[in-house]
Structures are given as structure tokens and as C-alpha cells.
Amino acid sequence: MYEEANAFRRNKFEEYAKKKIAYSEELRLETEREQKQLAAKYAMAAEERTGLTTEDVYYKALLHWISENLERTAASLAEYLARTDTVGEKAQTARSLLVVIYAKQKNFEDATRYLVEYDGREPRRASEVSRMNNELAKAYLAAQSPAKAVQFADRAYRTSKSMLADPSLKTRGLDELLDNGMLLFESQRDSGKAAEAESALTDMRNVAAGVGASDLYFYAADKLLVYLIDQGRKSAAMEGYMSALIEAGKAFSNKAVANDAIRRLKAREKHYKLMAEPAIELPGVDRWFPGQPQTLASLRGKVVLLDFWATWCGPCFDAFPHLTEWQRDYGDKGFVVLGVTRYYGRAEGFNVDNPNEIEFLKRFREKYRLPYDFVVTRDQQAQIQYGATALPTAVLIDRKGTIRFIESGSSPSRMEEMHRRIKALLAEQ
């Protein structure tokens, strides 16, 4: 039963590929939901059986794990470890999962107890060590205890670095290096240790250069530059930007990889220059609805999010639920979303003039129940001015009218970061 449930997602996507069914986020979520339901069904069937062997109890726990029933997973794993014949890899995996579960539940006492038990036994797998310490670091950060998160984030990061030496773990190691490196940075930053926070990002950038990962190099360099700007050290950030460009050209042995890192950094140059500067009025505004036209200067005292978007932009749609939620949750606290778009001369697959495009935008706003004003410009000057060459691009302006954040895209991590920024800016007076 476990093998079927565990392989369900992989088998379904192989089936979709054979049938030439296009991948979509909705399809992924539906497939995962079906997998969880199947695992839950099999887990409950196992619960009703008597005389389960030690191995049966272990796989019953894993079925609960797939179904995301943490309480039953923990109970089954504890039942498994209480048996006298639990040794080796399965027992260690059971302990590692208990650490993860208790960390997610903010039960730090039991999480650290099982971590100590895990560390005192063999075998110890790097992937499990990384995951356990990652979850504990995240839990302490969520509990507003960044100083306690540091030791776990540091161990998770060092472990993910060690994984890069094993070719079979390199891809996973890079993914975990990014996650754990950012956890270490955030833990140090939120603990008030600026030098250590900078060091974490610098080390991650250096590691990326060493293994030829241009995307990770850019990500670490970008986060460091934004952090320096946030710290009021913009001149140091711009010097760091030039240094990162030069270093990219030297550090990567593969010229194509070096050029990719340089291209990514140059695409952000406009944003670095705009951050920590006064917001510039939007040029060429033609229509503003349903509210009355305003200037950005008149909105001082509020936190403003300029969302540069277009009706044909798929990722823009992914941002709509977040923008809607934030406008409704924080509107009475002085938060304003403005959906900034421009005339494209197209609507619903047809060429249209400006008045008809406006009517289409009004219907679009109603259809998707977007509770904020649309700002329509005559041309792309506003996009160029704010470096919104990729859509969606979000610009956050603080209560004093200063640009504090600019990012493109609508990935979950980006939306999470934007939400954190919004709450921080609203807390400022």
C-alpha cells in the first residue's frame, strides 16, 4: 500500500505525459490531493488491522505522513520506535520525521530530544540532518526567537554545503543550500547581527561561484545588495553591485554561465538605483478607476504597492489573490494597492481602441473582484521609469514616499517576502 501511495504522483504525471495533458498548477494540486486521500485511506485500513509487524507500523506511519496527518504520523512513529527490533536506517528516519513534526508544532522540547537521539546513532544522512535543523530554525524564527534559530540554521547550511561534494546529492544540495543559506541570513539579521548576516550571503555567493551555479550566485548577490540598501548603505550596495559583476566574470570558468549571472544582475540595476529614493510620479496616466486620480505625493502617509501588470500576463493572475487579501486586510491601516497597466490595443483576442480597452478592463476588474484601483497609462514610460520590464513587478513605497522594495514575479517565496515587507512598512511611523 505504501509503495502505491508513494509512487502515485510520479505515476500520474507519467500518465499525463503519455496522454499529452499539459502541466498546470491546478493539475499538480489536484494530483497531490488525490495522493493524500489514497494514503489516508490506506493508513486507516492499516490502523484497523491487528498484529502489525514492526515494519508494518513503520509504513503505516509513512502513509499518515503522505496524507499530512501529523498527529497520527507521530503516534505511529512513536509506536514503531517503542518496538525492540527497530534499528538502522528506518529507525533514524523515524526520529528525523519526529523532529520535523514536533518542530512544525513548535514543540521544541520533543524536537530537540529526538534530534539528540538521532545524532547519537548511525547512520546519519546529510539530507535528514539538513531537514531537521532547517525545520527547527524555521520554527524558532516563526516563534520570534531568531537567536535560538541561528545554531540550527548554521548546521543546516553547513550540511547542505557538504552535500555538494557528492555528485548524487549535488542538485538537492543546491536547493537546500539556498533555503538554508537564507534561513541563516534571516536568523542573523533578525538577531541584530548585521556582519554575520552579510557573511552568510557572501559565503553563499562564493559557494555558488565555486560550483558554477549562476542562478544561486545572482540570488545571494541580489539579497546582499538589497540588504545593504535596507541598512541605509546604498553607496556600499552600488559598489558591491559593480564588484559582483566583475567577480562573476572571473569566478565562473564557463563563459555562458558567467554571462548569465551578469545578465541577471544588470537586469536589476535599475531597481537598485531606485530603492531608497523618493517615488517618481507615474507619467502618462490616462484613466484611473473606480476611484479618483491621485498623485503619489498625495498618498504620503500610506504604504503604497504599485503592481505593474497586464491582462495577458499569466503570473500576474497568481498575484491577484494576495493583492486582494492584503488590500482587504490592511486597507484600514493605511495600505493602498494600485494596479498599473497600459494600453496594449488588445482585448479578448481582438484589436481594440482605447475606450473599448477601458471597458474591457472594467469588466476584468469586476470579474476577478479586485478591490483596488486600476491606473491605465498611455504608453510604457511608467514601466520603464520603474524598471518594470518583466511582469508582474511590484514596487512598495513607504509612508514617507520612499521606494523600499522592487521585485518582479509572483512565486510563493516572492509573495511571502512582499507580505513580510508590507507588514514591516505598516509598522513604521
State where each predicted segment sits:
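N-proximal helix/coil linker or "cap" segments that precede and/or mark the start of modular domains
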Residues: 229-285, 297-300, 347
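Alpha-helical junction/boundary sensor with strong preference for TPR arrays
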Residues: 42-49, 84-85, 115, 122-123, ...
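Short active-site neighborhood of thiol/selenol oxidoreductases, capturing the structured segment around
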Residues: 293-317, 323, 337
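Thiol/disulfide oxidoreductase modules built on the thioredoxin-like
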Residues: 366-372, 376-423
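Helix-turn-helix repeat elements of alpha-solenoid scaffolds
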Residues: 24-41, 65-78, 103-116, 146-162, ...
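Structural microenvironment flanking redox-active thiols in thiol-disulfide oxidoreductases
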Residues: 13, 318-367, 376-384
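N-terminal leader/linker segments that initiate helical-solenoid repeat arrays
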Residues: 1-55
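A short beta-strand-turn-helix
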Residues: 282-304, 327-330
